[in-house]
């Protein structure tokens, strides 16, 4: 029997591991039947190559093969997969400049040849319809020995010449072993599900990482515990109970980080609590979620300029949510809004910033759909994100410590955006023809500037931070999609136009951009599982950026970028995952700086990929 299997696989020698597995199969009772087969797949994944106008050749290749062996009985199954992948890449970049009798040459070349081989065996045992157990073992090997070349020449600078050459051979040699056990149990006709898993994984490379994960699932809600042993050591745990109408989640995290260079140690402890409830009323349903996270962080460090110091702070984050779905005749509505409240207290007399408070107004989205008829529908969408207009930070200010002004002024840059996005979509569906038109408008306002006020509260001097609006943007988008689905031919066309204007009130900088894209695809079914098709993509994007001097009102600088990309793909495909694809890509970028051409680059790529 072993000779028959060896001749059918057309191999002359098999690893001892596979021979032992086949001997085990021959020893099973006669009632065990093969269900499945020995599968061999792979081939040359593809070759892509091209060259740019700045003499930058690019090469990308992929070769991948896979061997699968499957065995199955009524209550037992075994799958073994051997996979190999080789993916060489080469990128060269050469730039030559000449200005005022000064010659400059920059040459860089990088190549990688990563090889990955993995062997995985999976075992599954199903003693009953509502229970099963599974286990697996995985071995994976990665090797990458690349090359990096760099040459720099800078001549006749102060009557001197500079020449440097660098050669580097990065090496990656990694072994990975993973094993685990899973259990599955369903109760009450599948309404309640309990699933747990235990995973152990070890990686041996330049960095060693080992962790254990325990996962328990109920109604597809998961939790886990992880141990990560490396330069960064951490422990995390989660426990979640999820009946049909209640979601109770407790989680936590402990992080211990040790830095040898500056003898710094950081300890982070962050427990959390989340609660949510769900209810249903006829066809309408809603949910309320409240997330509360408590974070206690302790840090201690020592460097060359100061003695060892330590501090800790407590953070509280509360996020009440409201979600609801409504249906009435031909109208459907969905609401999902939240409100975030954040506060942090820093217990440290050195930094003098005991309290920080931030409130966030409702954040969420709504969607209203009106089905006029089976062929016509209107969809109105709205997204809203409103941050608190004032980020309040109260600090105890000591007049004898004048350095606090400089420390605080350059310490933080926070964003507090306001975002409003509204859209209207019309959809028409006929027998084989469909059309969809959508218009969206987006307004974004960012608050990144800061102002300071000194206030005296209860006999103490406080510094209060105020954040003000500094930039805003408006965008208009129009999309038109057309589709045809016939018995033989399927075609889709999409045209998208976007125009954005972004302005800053602090620097008087304005950026305008126009982006329009064309995507088209057509597929013809030839029968017997074969189909041929073509994909066409074109993108044109122009950006103009300029600043105005506030004092004089004159144009200071202007930059214009013009980007174009064209792609054409021809593909043949079979239902049994046999694919052949040829591609042609062209990419062009032109950059102007006040009428002067600074960069003009063009890349042309031609590639062939096939898979069986």
Predicted regions and their residues:
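Surface-exposed loop/turn segments flanking beta-strands in extracellular/periplasmic regions
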Residues: 90-104, 153-163, 215-236, 281-308, ...
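C-terminal extracellular loops and terminal segments
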Residues: 77-78, 468-479, 490-556
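Face-selective signature of the C-terminal outer-membrane beta-barrel domain
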Residues: 124-138, 170-348, 365, 371-379, ...
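Outer membrane beta-barrel strand-and-loop segments of large Gram-negative receptors
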Residues: 251, 411, 415, 434-494, ...
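Bacterial N-terminal signal peptides
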Residues: 15-26
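Membrane-proximal, glycine/serine-rich, low-complexity loop/turn segments characteristic
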Residues: 5, 30-206, 255-271, 325, ...
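Extracellular loop and loop/strand-boundary signature of outer-membrane beta-barrel proteins
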Residues: 51-55, 102-109, 163-169, 182-184, ...
């Amino acid at each position: 029997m072993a000779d028959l299997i060896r001749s059918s696989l057309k191999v002359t020698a098999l690893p001892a591991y596979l021979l032992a597995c086949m001997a085990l199969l021959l020893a099973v009772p006669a009632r065990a039947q093969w269900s499945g087969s020995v599968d061999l797949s792979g081939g040359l994944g593809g070759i892509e190559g091209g060259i740019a106008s700045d003499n930058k050749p690019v090469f990308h290749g992929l070769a991948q093969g896979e061997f699968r062996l499957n065995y199955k009985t009524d209550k037992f199954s075994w799958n073994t997969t051997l996979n190999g992948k080789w993916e060489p890449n080469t990128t060269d970049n050469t730039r030559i400049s000449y200005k005022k009798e000064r010659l400059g040459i920059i040459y860089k070349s990088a190549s990688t040849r990563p090889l990955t081989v993995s062997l995985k065996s999976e075992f599954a045992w199903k003693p009953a319809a509502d229970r099963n157990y599974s286990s697996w073992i995985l071995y994976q090997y990665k090797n990458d020995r690349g090359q990096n070349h760099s040459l720099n020449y800078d001549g006749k600078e102060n009557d001197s010449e500079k020449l440097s050459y660098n050669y580097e051979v990065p090496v990656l040699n990694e072994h990975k072993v993973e094993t685990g056990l899973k259990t599955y149990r369903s109760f009450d006709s599948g309404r309640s599900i309990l699933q747990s898993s235990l995973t152990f994984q070890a990686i041996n490379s330049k960095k060693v990482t080992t962790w254990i994960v325990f996962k328990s699932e109920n109604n597809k809600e998961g939790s886990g515990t992880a141990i990560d042993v490396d330069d960064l050591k951490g422990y995390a745990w989660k426990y979640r109970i999820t009946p049909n109408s209640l979601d109770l989640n407790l989680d936590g995290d402990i992080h211990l980080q040790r830095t040898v260079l500056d003898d710094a140690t950081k300890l982070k402890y962050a427990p959390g609590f989340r609660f949510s409830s769900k209810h249903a009323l006829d066809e309408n349903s809603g949910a309320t979620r409240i997330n509360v996270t408590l974070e206690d962080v302790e840090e201690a460090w020592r460097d060359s300029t100061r003695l060892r110091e330590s501090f800790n702070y407590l953070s509280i984050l509360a996020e009440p949510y409201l979600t609801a779905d409504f249906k009435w005749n031909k109208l459907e509505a969905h609401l999902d809004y939240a409100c975030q409240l954040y506060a942090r207290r820093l217990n440290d007399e050195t930094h003098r910033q005991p309290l920080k408070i931030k409130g966030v107004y409702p954040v969420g989205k709504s969607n209203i759909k009106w089905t006029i008829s089976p062929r016509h529908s209107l969809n109105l969408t709205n997204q809203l994100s409103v941050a608190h207009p004032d980020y309040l930070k109260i600090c105890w200010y000591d007049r004898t410590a004048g350095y606090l002004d400089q420390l605080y002024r350059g310490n933080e840059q926070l964003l507090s955006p306001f975002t409003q996005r509204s859209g209207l979509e019309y959809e028409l569906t006929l027998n084989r023809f469909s059309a969809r038109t959508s218009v969206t408008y987006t307004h974004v306002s960012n608050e990144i500037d800061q102002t300071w006020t000194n206030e005296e509260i209860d006999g103490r001097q406080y510094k209060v931070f105020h954040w003000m609006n500094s930039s805003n943007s408006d965008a208009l988008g129009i999309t038109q999609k057309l589709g045809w689905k016939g018995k033989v031919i399927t075609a889709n066309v999409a045209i998208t136009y976007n125009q954005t204007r972004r302005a800053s009130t602090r620097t008087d900088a304005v950026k305008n951009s126009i982006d329009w894209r064309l995507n088209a695809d057509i597929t013809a079914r030839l029968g017997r599982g074969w189909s041929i098709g073509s994909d066409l993509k074109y993108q044109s994007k122009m950006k103009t950026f300029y600043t105005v001097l506030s004092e004089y009102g004159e144009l200071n600088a202007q930059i214009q970028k013009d980007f174009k990309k064209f792609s054409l793909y021809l593909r043949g495909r079979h239902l049994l995952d046999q694919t052949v694809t040829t591609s042609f890509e062209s990419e062009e970028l032109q950059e102007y700086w006040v009428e002067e051409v600074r960069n003009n680059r063009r890349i042309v790529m031609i590639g062939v990929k096939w898979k069986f």
